[in-house]
From Swiss-Prot:
Source taxon at top rank: Eukaryota
Record-annotated membrane-spanning stretches: none
Family according to the record: Belongs to the CCDC69 family.
Annotated segments matching region Disordered: 13-41
GO annotation (BP), single: spindle midzone assembly
The name this protein goes by in its record: Coiled-coil domain-containing protein 69
Keyword terms, alphabetized: Coiled coil, Cytoplasm, Cytoskeleton, Lipoprotein, Myristate
Coiled-coil stretches noted in the UniProt entry, renumbered to this chain: 42-167, 216-278
Subcellular location: Cytoplasm, Cytoskeleton, Spindle; Midbody
Function description: May act as a scaffold to regulate the recruitment and assembly of spindle midzone components.
GO-annotated cellular components: cytoplasm; midbody; spindle midzone
């Protein structure tokens, strides 16, 4: 009985053991599954954190690259702007220098023409004065010749007085009636001489008066001509001074126009920059827009024109 019973119990025990072992196996498997399932969220969290960190790193790197590119682009734009402004200033200076040279050439031509006119006038005046001087010399020479002629005439008069009709009549009277005395004879001769000399002197003075009248008329003409030349010289001097004043005024107006033009250019450049900044803010908020150098290169020449 006991053996039979023990034989019957052994399979049951083994079955129980198998069931127990199976249950224990299931339990350990479930535990392992649960452990595995409990570990998966941690791994996911770690992966998410890692992904977020990588994302932040990428974003930071992208922001750094973006800032570097923006700085580089800004520096390039500023350099290009300065280069274009320098070129524009150089062109403006060249144009102004060309204009000044043209005006200087024009003024030089005008001054040379005025100088030529003055030289011509001076030459004419010099020739006129030379002619006047020569005329005066000739007049003096004529006067000397006239005095020589007068001396010869006086000598001739003396001779004629001695041979005059009065003298001859007086000598015949003396021969016919005798001499009235030495004293009266000398007085009468002196009187005859004085009468003849006075008559000749009256004729000479009349001739001299006519000559002086002609000389005075010629001197009046020369004085009038001299006054006319002097007035012309004064007018030329005044005109030259006016030309100098006009030249100074034109230079001052040119400098003022240049300063006004530069102010307008600076104001226009400032307005263009403000316009671009407002456009950047309107498109991208506070972040400056990255625009190409080509577009700025096309806009900047418009600003400096």
């Amino acid at each position: 009985m006991g053996c039979k019973t023990s034989k019957m119990c052994c399979p049951r025990l083994r079955k129980k053991k198998r069931q127990k072992a199976h249950q224990e196996g299931l339990t350990s498997k479930e535990l392992n599954d649960l452990n595995a399932k409990s570990q998966e969220p941690n791994e996911l969290l770690q992966k998410i954190k890692k992904y977020e960190q990588e994302t932040r790193d990428i974003l930071q790197k992208h922001q750094a690259e973006k800032a570097a590119l923006a700085d580089t682009h800004k520096a390039d734009v500023e350099a290009r702007t300065l280069e274009l402004q320098a070129q524009a200033q150089k062109d403006r200076d060249a144009d102004i220098a060309k204009l000044l040279l043209e005006q200087a050439a024009t003024i030089k031509v005008e001054m040379e023409e005025k100088l030529a006119e003055l030289q011509k006038s001076n030459e004419q005046e010099k020739a006129s004065l030379t002619e006047t001087h020569q005329q005066l010399i000739d007049s003096l020479q004529e006067r000397v010749d006239e005095l020589k002629t007068q001396l010869a005439s006086f000598q001739e008069k003396m001779k004629r007085v001695e041979e005059s009709v009065l003298s001859q009549d007086y000598r015949r009277h003396i021969q016919d009636h005798g001499s009235p005395g030495q004293f009266w004879e000398q007085e009468i001769q002196s009187l005859h001489f004085v009468i003849e000399m006075k008559s000749e002197l009256i004729r000479e003075q009349d001739k001299r008066l006519r000559s002086h009248k002609s000389t005075m008329e010629r001197n009046l003409v020369l004085e009038e001509r001299s006054r006319t030349l002097q007035q012309e010289n004064e007018a030329l001097k005044v005109q030259t001074q006016k030309q100098g004043a006009v030249t100074v005024r034109l230079s001052e107006e040119l400098l003022s126009t240049q300063a006004t033009l530069e102010k307008q250019i600076h104001l226009r450049e400032k307005l263009e920059r403000e316009k671009e900044q407002n456009l950047y803010r309107a498109v991208n908020g506070d972040i400056p827009q990255q625009f190409s150098l080509q577009s700025n290169a096309q806009e900047l020449p418009v600003m400096v024109l």
